[in-house]
Amino acid sequence: MAEVSAQDLISQLSKSPESHKRKEYLHWDDYFMATSLLSAKRSKDPVTQVGACIVDSQNRIVAIGYNGFPRNCSDDVFPWSKAKKGSQEFDPLEDKKMYVVHAEANAILNSNGMSLSGTRLYTTLFPCNECAKLIIQVGISQVLYLSDKYADKPTYRASKRMLDAVGVEYKRHIPQKKTITIDFDTFPEEDPNASLGLNELHL
């Protein structure tokens, strides 16, 4: 049997896919925007689901949030629809906008008082003027968003006006990956007794 030199062995190992880093890993921006999208899945809003994620300069997630009613305000009692102005049954108190906390605001509130100065905000929908006020007040320096579908509405034009005035950068995130799949069956099911060490008990 021919002897394999150390140099040949190193050469063979270096050609193995397992000896190099995986190339299909998520880019940071895709990772954080995906976190926002996943957070949006928690929203009970039947029409609009928005998620947001705040990240510090070390690429650590500080807080996440999604649009929904304030804590302890029942999702089954408060209205999820928009009241139609001009209709005979118009009632402003039956409009969800009176009660919903936006994803960006929830993320900021969920930071539990931590300093957000210099952080980045990832959001699935461009922030409205009310959220822009909060973004500016807490010192978030950059906003990355997926959709700006309401760009022509005064609410969002006002948002951009404020962000521009104070130098908060905002840009649309262009994903490097169009699809990210979460498969809970990726990892084999573990023996529920294993974590308890029951398989090692001898009675």
From Swiss-Prot:
Annotated residues for binding of Zn(2+): H102, C128, C131
Segments forming domain CMP/dCMP-type deaminase: 27-163
GO cellular component assignments: cytoplasm
Annotated catalysed reactions: dCMP + H2O + H(+) = dUMP + NH4(+)
GO-annotated biological processes: cytidine deamination; dTMP biosynthetic process; dUMP biosynthetic process
SUPFAM superfamilies given in the database record: Cytidine deaminase-like
Gene3D superfamilies reported for this sequence: Cytidine Deaminase, domain 2
Xref: PROSITE patterns: CYT_DCMP_DEAMINASES_1, CYT_DCMP_DEAMINASES_2
Cofactor(s) in the UniProt record: Zn(2+)
CDD domains according to UniProt: deoxycytidylate_deaminase (cd01286)
Catalytic residue list: E104
MF (Gene Ontology): dCMP deaminase activity; zinc ion binding
EC number: 3.5.4.12
Pfam family membership, one: dCMP_cyt_deam_1
UniProt keyword annotation of Coiled coil present: no
Family: Belongs to the cytidine and deoxycytidylate deaminase family.
Its job: Supplies the nucleotide substrate for thymidylate synthetase.
Protein name per its UniProtKB record: Probable deoxycytidylate deaminase
Organism: Drosophila melanogaster (Fruit fly)
